[in-house]
């Protein structure tokens, strides 16, 4: 009967006393009276304590509500005393285990209070502007979409908690044999680690509306306390001892010691994530850092969607949201988790491509706003309508980066972050064939040995998921195997970094090539895929695909290079045999007035090491400049060779003799012109004599 009253008091505490009245109550001394107080329509509760009895009478109709029935259903009335005792003693009590820690922070904020700023509406979004800077209210634009009204926890927690009735959004992330459940509410968030037998649950925030069943008290589960929040840890003693002993000692203590605002949490997550990637933990069993990353992911979304009331510049809002989305992309890539989006409807209004310009976000034209908005829209899983002029901006973005770095200069961190967004856009596009093919072929061309050296040196200091990106991690460079990478790095005595590089490539590189119909069936093959506008070149060490093939003969026996050409919309047919074979012919003349060499590729390869690099050629002038001796691109080395891939599927060999002949022919043309001018000048003077 104690459980009934416990449940009743819980109902009262949730809904208030407004509609709940105890009609009759009395106290009497035992054996002093025999008066009967039973009445129809009332439930009588008698509580005996030594020589005193307390009697409560409550209307039966109060127990007809569904949620009341659910509360009573959550109580086990068949539990024996031994079971009850075992239930009490088996849980992990942070206070008795000396695991409780209390922190006092001085919270600060850079959020601008709402003042007498001017207002304007852009894309149905109310904005404020002051001194040409546009602001939005973070409490509005960061509202999370809560799609459920009751958050249901795993079965193991029914021993401790009554059902939680809160608006919430719940997501499940499957990782190997572990399920991470994240439930976000306006007051707190819950993250549980479920392995089938040994579950761990964290609850963080304002936990005043979470009710524990007797004899448990909330204070028994407090694991961390800050100025404004409590962190509850609910699990068994044996679970901590057998699987997660680190929870007794340390759990993100550096977070609680700081002002855990959004920017700090994002930076902490990125630092942990980059180390996690390089150390090869992705796809491995759950460890301490896995706990940290999943908790930080939930904590960041919780604080992002519930804390702060004031104004922030639109660009800062956009960049922060981009970082939040990137955290989710990391989980998808590293933990192989299925996409499970948390939706922010007001943020979608900011992702508007229909406006002429983005001056309300920033007047800095070097910031790739179109790429940012496309990344966010595609990451949300939405089908977006992007005008052609915006796609052109994105295309110009990747072309500008390529033009700057095609002759092997080091990429800056902002440029790497930009390329990360472009790569994600290229991986996510279903339609827009032209732009996604352009993105992938230029990324593939930006990957060369020098970029690999620069990137490897940078990995020691990288602390950000986006700036950690290299174009060598594009989905179409599956030819970069452990052996190839080790060979490249060994030339600079960097082969000790091979594992770090391969760990990073395996996370960033999209596994499937389903965005390209003609090569989707060979996603697992070790090959390079070069996506020109209407055809795709595949370079591999064996026959893998039905198409027109070219075999490179100027390599040693141990090195094989097979080039296969497939049309844009052809059906992907894997094969181990020759399908249609052509010979590679030398090219004798590279001059053209019809842009024959536009949108082509120059491929450098070595007799022993195989493919070295690709260079995308936008027009004939670029090709002439590339093979000019002054650019030092052409290496006069008997082991090094060059091929020219044209956009029509033709493959030619560029030889040193051809280059010299081309240069000589140009000199001869100039010489002929000079001779003709001299002859004409002489004829002119002869005619003047008559």
Swiss-Prot record:
**Entry's localization field:** Virion membrane; Host cell membrane; Host endosome membrane
PTM entry text: N-glycosylated, O-glycosylated, and sialylated.
The protein's matches in InterPro entries, at most eight in alphabetical order, are given as:
Herpes_gH (IPR003493), Herpes_glycoH_C (IPR035305), Herpes_glycoH_C_sf (IPR038172)
Intravirion topological domain: 689-690
What positions does the record give for glycosylation? 24, 34, 51, 137, 206, 410, 534, 569, 589, 648
For this record, the Gene Ontology CC terms, alphabetical, are:
host cell endosome membrane; host cell plasma membrane; membrane; viral envelope; virion membrane
Q: How does it sit in the membrane?
A: Single-pass type I membrane protein
Keywords tagged on the record? Fusion of virus membrane with host cell membrane, Fusion of virus membrane with host membrane, Glycoprotein, Host cell membrane, Host endosome, Host membrane, Membrane, Sialic acid, Signal, Transmembrane, Transmembrane helix, Viral envelope protein, Viral penetration into host cytoplasm, Virion, Virus entry into host cell
Query: Per the record, what ranges lie on the membrane's Virion surface side?
Result: 17-667
Region listing for Interaction with gL, in residue ranges: 174-234
Signal peptide boundaries: 1-16
Q: Which GO terms describe its biological process?
A: fusion of virus membrane with host plasma membrane; symbiont entry into host cell
Coiled coil regions in record: none
Locate the transmembrane regions by residue number: 668-688
Determine if Nucleotide-binding is one of this entry's keywords.
no
Family membership? Belongs to the herpesviridae glycoprotein H family.
Q: How does it assemble?
A: Interacts with glycoprotein L (gL); this interaction is necessary for the correct processing and cell surface expression of gH. The heterodimer gH/gL seems to interact with gB trimers during fusion. Interacts with glycoprotein O (gO).
Q: What does this protein do?
A: The heterodimer glycoprotein H-glycoprotein L is required for the fusion of viral and plasma membranes leading to virus entry into the host cell. Following initial binding to host receptor, membrane fusion is mediated by the fusion machinery composed of gB and the heterodimer gH/gL. May also be involved in the fusion between the virion envelope and the outer nuclear membrane during virion morphogenesis.
Q: What is the official name of this protein in its record?
A: Envelope glycoprotein H
């Amino acid at each position: 009967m104690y459980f009934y009253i416990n449940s009743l008091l819980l109902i009262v505490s949730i809904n208030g006393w407004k509609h709940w009245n105890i009609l009759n109550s009395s106290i009497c001394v035992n054996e002093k009276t025999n008066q009967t107080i039973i009445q129809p329509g009332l439930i009588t509760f008698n509580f005996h304590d030594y020589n005193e009895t307390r009697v409560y009478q409550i209307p039966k109709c109060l127990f007809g509500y569904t949620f009341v029935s659910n509360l009573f259903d959550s109580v086990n009335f068949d539990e024996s005393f031994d079971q009850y005792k075992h239930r009490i003693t088996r849980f992990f009590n942070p206070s008795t285990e000396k695991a409780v820690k209390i922190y006092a922070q001085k919270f600060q904020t850079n959020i601008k209070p709402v003042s007498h700023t001017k207002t304007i509406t852009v894309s149905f979004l109310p904005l404020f502007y002051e001194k040409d800077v546009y602001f939005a209210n973070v409490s509005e634009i960061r509202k999370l979409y809560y799609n459920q009204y009751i958050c249901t926890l795993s079965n193991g927690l029914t021993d401790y908690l009554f059902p939680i009735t809160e608006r919430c959004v719940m997501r499940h992330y499957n990782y190997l044999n572990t399920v991470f459940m994240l439930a976000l509410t306006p007051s707190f968030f819950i993250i549980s680690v479920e392995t089938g037998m040994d579950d761990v649950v964290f609850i963080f925030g304002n936990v005043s509306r979470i009710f524990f069943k007797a004899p448990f008290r909330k204070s028994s589960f407090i694991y961390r306390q800050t100025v404004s929040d409590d962190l509850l840890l609910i699990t068994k003693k044996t679970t901590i001892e057998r699987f997660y002993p680190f929870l007794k000692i340390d759990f993100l203590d550096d977070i609680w010691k700081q002002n855990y605002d959004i920017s700090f949490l994002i930076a902490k997550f990125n630092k942990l994530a980059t180390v996690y990637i390089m150390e090869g933990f992705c796809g491995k069993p759950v460890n301490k850092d896995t706990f940290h990353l999943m908790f930080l992911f939930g904590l960041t979304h919780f604080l992002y969607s519930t804390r702060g009331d004031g104004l922030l510049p639109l660009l800062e809002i956009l960049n922060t949201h981009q970082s939040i989305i990137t955290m989710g992309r990391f989980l998808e890539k590293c933990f192989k988790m299925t996409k499970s989006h948390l939706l922010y409807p007001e943020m979608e209004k900011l992702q508007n491509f229909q406006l002429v310009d983005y001056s309300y976000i920033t007047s800095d034209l070097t910031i790739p706003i179109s790429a940012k908005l496309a990344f966010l829209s595609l990451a949300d899983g939405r089908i977006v309508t992007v005008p052609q002029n915006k796609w052109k901006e994105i295309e110009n973005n990747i072309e500008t980066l390529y033009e700057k770095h095609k002759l092997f200069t080091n990429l800056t961190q902002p440029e790497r972050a930009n390329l990360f967004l472009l790569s994600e856009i290229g991986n996510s596009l279903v339609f827009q064939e032209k732009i996604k093919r352009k993105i992938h072929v230029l990324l593939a061309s930006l990957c060369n040995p020098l970029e690999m050296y620069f990137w490897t040196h940078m990995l020691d200091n990288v602390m950000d998921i986006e700036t950690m990106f290299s174009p060598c991690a594009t989905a179409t460079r599956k030819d970069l195997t452990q052996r190839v990478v080790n060979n490249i790095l060994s030339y600079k005595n960097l082969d000790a970094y091979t594992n770090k590089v391969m760990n990073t490539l395996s996370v960033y590189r999209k596994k499937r090539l389903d965005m390209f119909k003609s090569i989707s069936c060979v996603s697992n093959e070790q090959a390079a895929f070069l996506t020109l506008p209407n055809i795709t070149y595949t370079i591999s060490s064996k026959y893998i695909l039905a198409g027109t093939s070219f075999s490179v003969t100027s390599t040693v026996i141990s090195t094989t290079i097979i080039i296969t050409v497939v049309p844009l919309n052809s059906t992907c047919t894997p094969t181990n045999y020759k399908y249609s074979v052509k010979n590679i012919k030398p090219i004798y003349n590279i001059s053209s007035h019809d842009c024959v060499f536009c949108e082509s590729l120059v491929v450098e390869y070595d007799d022993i090491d195989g493919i070295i690099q690709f260079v995308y050629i936008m027009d004939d002038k670029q090709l002439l400049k590339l093979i000019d001796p002054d650019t030092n691109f052409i290496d006069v080395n008997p082991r090094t060779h060059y091929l020219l891939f044209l956009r029509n599927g033709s493959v030619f060999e560029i030889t040193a003799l051809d280059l010299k002949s081309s240069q000589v022919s140009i000199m001869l043309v100039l010489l002929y012109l000079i001779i003709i001018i001299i002859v004409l000048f002489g004829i002119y003077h002869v005619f003047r004599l008559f």
